Amino acid sequence: MTDDKDVLRDVWFGRIPTCFTLYQDEITEREAEPYYLLLPRVSYLTLVTDKVKKHFQKVMRQEDVSEIWFEYEGTPLKWHYPIGLLFDLLASSSALPWNITVHFKSFPEKDLLHCPCKDAVEAHFMSCVKEADALKHKSQVINEMQRKDHKQLWMGLQNDRFDQFWTINRKLMEYPPEENGFRYIPFRIYQTTTERPFIQKLFRPVAADGQLHTLGDLLREVCPSAVAPEDGEKKSQVMIHGIEPLLETPLQWLSEHLSYPDNFLHISIVPQPTD
C-alpha cells in the first residue's frame, strides 16, 4: 500500500465530543449528572462506554438496571456500527457535543441486537475483517495469519493502539504490484432516506481498460441518487470519517486509507444541509 501514514493516524485518532445523559424516565436515587467523553470514531459504543455505564449506575438501584443501550433523537444506536458511521449518518449536521441518551430499560428488540459481552463485539469485528479479505484477496491473507495475529488486530482496536493494530492490518492492505489493487473493494453505503440497512455489491478498483475507478464511479453505478447531475443542484453529502472526499479520489486509495478497522469503507449518504 502507499504509505500515507499521516492520513492513517488522522483517521485513527479522530474523536467526537459526546455528552451522555440518562433518560428522564429512568429511576434514580439522586440526580444523574451528564457524562462527557471523547469517542473514538473507529471504535464501537460497547467498547468505550464502560465509564458511562459505571457513572450512571452509581445513582441507580441495582434492580432498576438491565442491559444498557443508547439513543440519539429517538433512534436507537446500533452497537455493531462503528461510532464514526453512526455520527456521520445521524448527527453530522448537528452541533457538538453529540448528545446521546442512555437507557437501562425497555430494550428495543426490533431495532437492536443484544450485546451480552465484548466477545460479541470481537466476533462481529473479526467476521467483517474476514469478509473484507474474502473480497480483497480470496481470504488468502487472513487465512495465512496465525490466531495471535487476529488477536493483535482486535486488541489494537480495543486498547486504542495504532501501531499494534497497523503492524498486522498493513498485511491486509497489500496486493501484488502487477494487479494495481484489490480484487474487489469492501464497501457499504448507508442512507437515512431508506429502510434498507446498506448497499453492498461487487465492485473492482480497476476498470477493464486499466483505469483506476473513483468514488464517483462507484456511486454512479450503485447509488446514482447520491451524485448530482452536472447541471443540477447538489442534494446529498457523501461522508467517510466526517469528511467529504472528492468524487475523483481513486477507490483503491480510499480503501487503503479511509477504511474502518473492519477493513470496510463505510460511506454515509446524508441530505445536504440547507443552511
Curated annotation (Swiss-Prot):
GO terms for biological process: aggrephagy; antigen processing and presentation of endogenous antigen; apoptotic process; autophagosome assembly; autophagy; axonal transport; blood vessel remodeling; cardiac muscle cell apoptotic process. It is found in: Cytoplasm; Preautophagosomal structure membrane. InterPro entries: Atg5 (IPR007239), ATG5_HBR (IPR048940), Atg5_HR (IPR042526), ATG5_UblA (IPR048939), Atg5_UblA_dom_sf (IPR042527), ATG5_UblB (IPR048318). Conjugated to ATG12; which is essential for autophagy, but is not required for association with isolation membrane. The keyword Nuclease does not apply. There is a cross-link at residue 130 (Glycyl lysine isopeptide (Lys-Gly) (interchain with G-Cter in ATG12)). Keywords: Acetylation, Apoptosis, Autophagy, Cytoplasm, Immunity, Isopeptide bond, Membrane, Ubl conjugation. One of its GO terms (molecular function) is Atg8-family ligase activity. The modification N-acetylmethionine is found at residue 1. PANTHER family: AUTOPHAGY PROTEIN 5. Forms a conjugate with ATG12. Part of the minor complex composed of 4 sets of ATG12-ATG5 and ATG16L1 (400 kDa); this complex interacts with ATG3 leading to disruption of ATG7 interaction and promotion of ATG8-like proteins lipidation. Forms an 800-kDa complex composed of ATG12-ATG5 and ATG16L2. The ATG12-ATG5 conjugate interacts with RAB33A; this interaction is bridged by ATG16L1 and promotes ATG12-ATG5-ATG16L1 complex recruitment to phagophores. Interacts with TECPR1; the interaction is direct and does not take place when ATG16L1 is associated with the ATG5-ATG12 conjugate. Belongs to the ATG5 family. This is Autophagy protein 5. It comes from Rattus norvegicus.
